[in-house]
A protein has these predicted regions:
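Short alpha-beta junction capping motif
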Residues: 14-60, 139
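Extracellular ligand-binding/catalytic regions of CAZymes and related secreted enzymes
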Residues: 124-126, 136-169
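Aromatic-Pro/Gly-enriched surface loop or interdomain linker
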Residues: 1-18, 168
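Solvent-exposed loop/turn segments at secondary-structure junctions
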Residues: 7-9, 26-29, 53-57, 122-124, ...
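Alpha-helical scaffolding within the catalytic cores
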Residues: 4-9, 35, 126-132
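Catalytic beta-strand/loop cores that center a nucleophilic Ser/Cys/Thr
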Residues: 16, 69, 74-139
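Hydrophobic residues in well-ordered beta-strands that form the structural core
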Residues: 3, 49-50, 144
């Protein structure tokens, strides 16, 4: 595993990795960096978008097409139940519904292009929103998990299980 805040690695150095995880909403990608990331995924690399990854790089249309999600707001920080949509998937197998206190993300998302794994009901809006999904992109794999605002949710064992399994997928 390696950590970098330098987006230039997207343009030049992803061949050494099996997957990339984004947990950021800072800055923009250059066209070269975006092309490098998209080429990496299209060629068989994995991409894991966590929480603010859907709010990242607002000007990068290719990135958001690859992710199949674009941040469209969130609820107040509140308690809600995360429901398993597909208990037979390796990422969610054996996982029971669980409660968290976090932001409930609203995404612009095409549900027909991804396999939904987790969802949550927002009482404040009387709406159900996808919390985790996966799909392929070219030869690569893309996984997104919307939770992750603060330490309380990061320390939740169910959150950690989904993160680990999503990263391995």
């Amino acid at each position: 595993a390696s950590f970098s805040r330098d987006y230039e690695v997207l343009a030049t150095g992803l061949s050494l990795f099996e997957a990339v995880l984004f947990y950021t909403d800072v800055g923009e990608l250059t066209k070269t960096q975006e092309r490098g990331l998209l080429s990496f995924v299209d060629s068989g690399g994995g991409f894991f978008g966590l929480h603010t990854a859907a709010a990242s790089f607002r000007e990068c249309e290719g990135y958001h097409r690859m992710l199949n999600g674009f941040f469209n707001g969130h609820s107040p920080h509140m308690k809600f139940t995360v429901t398993v949509s597909d208990p037979g998937d390796p990422i969610t197998e054996g996982l029971a519904d669980f409660e968290v206190t976090d932001e409930l993300y609203y995404l612009k998302h095409d549900p027909g292009k991804s396999h939904h794994l987790l969802q949550a009901y927002d009482e404040t809006r009387d709406e159900t929103h996808v919390m985790a999904f996966k799909h392929t992109c070219g030869e690569g794999r893309v996984f997104f998990f919307a939770l992750g605002h603060d330490m309380a949710v990061l320390e939740n064992p169910n959150f950690q299980q989904v993160v680990l399994r999503g990263a391995l997928w």
